[in-house]
């Protein structure tokens, strides 16, 4: 059954002591690096969702700093479940660096230095997020939007 409406989700690019957290999830094909995140629940703001999802998936308490990027994925072949997603991607600050993965959602993590993260093997949506972060980190604080990339019509 095809869903009738897009699925709003959040992603967290988590920073702590000038290092950025990336994770691997079995939900993403090709086992590339991505960011923790998930669905926004009914009655929950995007900021509340990112705090909850970061805690559930990584064990980290985070503070949302900025909404960096909004992007859409329509039936992407990179994700295990082809749907229409709206990604609200936040930069978040971790209160500590003691990661405890939810192994049902994630199977690996790594703290990357800011300089090396742009060379990491990431899926395409995280690549867009890292570009938005680089702009933000260089002083350009505008919100970016990446239009639909559809695999099917």
Each PLM stretch: what is its role?
Residues 67-70:
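Residue-level recognition of beta-strand microenvironments
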Residues 1-20, 88-91:
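Conserved N-terminal beta-strand and adjoining loop/helix that marks the start
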Residues 10, 62-65:
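Small-residue-enriched segments and motifs
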Residues 16-56:
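Conserved Nudix-box catalytic region and its N-terminal flanking loop in Nudix hydrolases
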Residues 5, 13, 26, 99-102:
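Generic structural signal for beta-strand residues in well-ordered domains
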């Amino acid at each position: 059954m095809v869903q009738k409406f897009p699925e709003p989700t959040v992603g967290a690019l988590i920073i702590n002591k000038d290092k950025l957290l990336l994770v691997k999830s079995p939900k993403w094909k090709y086992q590339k690096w991505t960011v923790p995140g998930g669905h926004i629940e009914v009655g929950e703001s995007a900021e509340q969702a990112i705090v909850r999802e970061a805690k559930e998936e990584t064990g980290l308490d985070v503070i949302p700093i900025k909404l960096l990027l909004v992007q859409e994925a329509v039936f992407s072949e990179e994700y295990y479940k082809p749907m229409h997603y709206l990604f609200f991607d936040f930069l978040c600050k971790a209160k500590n660096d003691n990661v405890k993965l939810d192994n049902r959602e994630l199977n690996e993590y790594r703290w990357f230095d800011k300089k090396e993260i742009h060379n990491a093997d990431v899926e395409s949506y995280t690549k867009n997020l890292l570009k938005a972060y680089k702009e933000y980190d260089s002083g350009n604080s505008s919100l970016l939007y990446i239009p639909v990339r559809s695999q099917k019509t």
